[in-house]
């Protein structure tokens, strides 16, 4: 069974490392990555080490679709105020912020 995952706040170092691990995991499909500032731009514009491994583009948080597993890589303290919103998107959430 493939796990569909998304990363909220994927433009920083933590988001990039999460993406690298998930992209090479045989049981995970990295479905979406978010950045408000970079929405519409290629994910690899900020993580050139992953060129050739993904064609994902950044989407704003408002466009994130439900998934199986949601990773939060937001600046410290930002996730807590929006946990209800995130809980509606995935049954499992990992907060790395």
Question: Where are the language model's segments positioned?
Answer:
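N-terminal Rossmann-like NAD(P) cofactor-binding subdomain of oxidoreductases
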Residues: 1-97
């Amino acid at each position: 069974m493939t796990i569909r995952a998304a990363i909220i706040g994927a433009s920083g170092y933590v988001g990039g490392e999460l993406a690298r691990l998930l992209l090479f995991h045989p049981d995970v499909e990295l479905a979406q990555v978010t950045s408000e500032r970079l929405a519409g731009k290629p994910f690899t514009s900020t993580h050139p080490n992953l060129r050739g491994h993904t064609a994902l583009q950044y989407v704003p948080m408002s466009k994130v679709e439900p998934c199986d597993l949601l990773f939060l890589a937001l600046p410290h303290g930002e996730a807590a105020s929006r946990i209800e919103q995130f809980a509606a998107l995935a049954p499992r959430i990992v907060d790395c912020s």
